[in-house]
Amino acid sequence: MTARQDDQANEGYQHRSVLLDAAVDYLVTDENGRYVDATFGRGGHSRLILGKLGQGGQLLGIDKDPEAIAVARELASGDSRFQWYHGSFAELDLALERQGWSQVDGVLMDLGVSSPQLDDASRGFSFMRDGPLDMRMNPQQEPSAAQWLAEADEREIADVIWRYGEERFSRRIARLVVERRQEQPIETTRQLAELVAEAVPKKEKHKHPATRAFQAIRIFINRELEDLEAGLAAAVDRLAPGGRLVVISFHSLEDRLVKRFMRDLARGPKLPKGIPVTAEQEESGFQLIGKASKANEQEITENVRARSAVMRVLERKAN
């Protein structure tokens, strides 16, 4: 899953997963291991993982988007090593229990909204294409962005746009939303984008004024940060010795959460001062692998949306 809200105008782009080769190279350490692509999308990472696995290897693809699962079904029909689970990676424990897997050798998370989702106007993620104001990764869940904006009070709207979009003009946007919805329902992406552009001064040359507001509403509607916290915790609990968690994030809120989570695990447990402990008790069971990685110039040239991608890798130490 590669495309992100900060740039949605690249019409000629053909979907290709960001940091594709690097992520899979870090992830696959055993060709006969068990792996999870926790954000299957359109299968870019999964296909490359399967290409690196031997006949004894297994891969589980997870996604909450029914359109992604349709692609996963097709892949599973042609490769017995691949299985799929329809749901959020926050449900990783349940997904693995259904597979009968107690541990895995690696989990890959490629966060945010995918290029196909952004490029499909009917999904309502993009302010560059007019469509219904939906923004749900799983259309079966409630509410849609339009429903929420119709019902939420001004304070809640402002808080969401500030918390998840870090938008300085969140209160001004919220006030205008409440005013305009009394005149007519805000039901399309164009309506919302024009409203936000009216409320927010256009200071950043290459960024649409609605970027932060759209990001914030999408994150809130899909519970992205809550799911991320749950998914990270479940992933490390299920890692076998030597297993790796590879996470690609696309905005600072995600990356700060991932960075803090991995750093704290690698540092080891916080133990009370003055209490005798063994070296084993002080040592962390995890280690960071390399430094944070970013897309190279070629990837950014091929897909300008890759410019904000950051990849981090955590490994459970072998016994």
Swiss-Prot record:
The keyword DNA-binding does not apply. GO terms for molecular function: rRNA (cytosine-N4-)-methyltransferase activity. It comes from the Bacteria. The gene is rsmH. The lineage of its organism: Bacteria, Pseudomonadati, Pseudomonadota, Gammaproteobacteria, Pseudomonadales. It comes from Marinobacter nauticus (strain ATCC 700491 / DSM 11845 / VT8) (Marinobacter aquaeolei). This is Ribosomal RNA small subunit methyltransferase H. Keywords: Cytoplasm, Methyltransferase, rRNA processing, S-adenosyl-L-methionine, Transferase. The keyword Methyltransferase applies. HAMAP family: 16SrRNA_methyltr_H. It catalyses: cytidine(1402) in 16S rRNA + S-adenosyl-L-methionine = N(4)-methylcytidine(1402) in 16S rRNA + S-adenosyl-L-homocysteine + H(+). GO terms for biological process: rRNA base methylation.
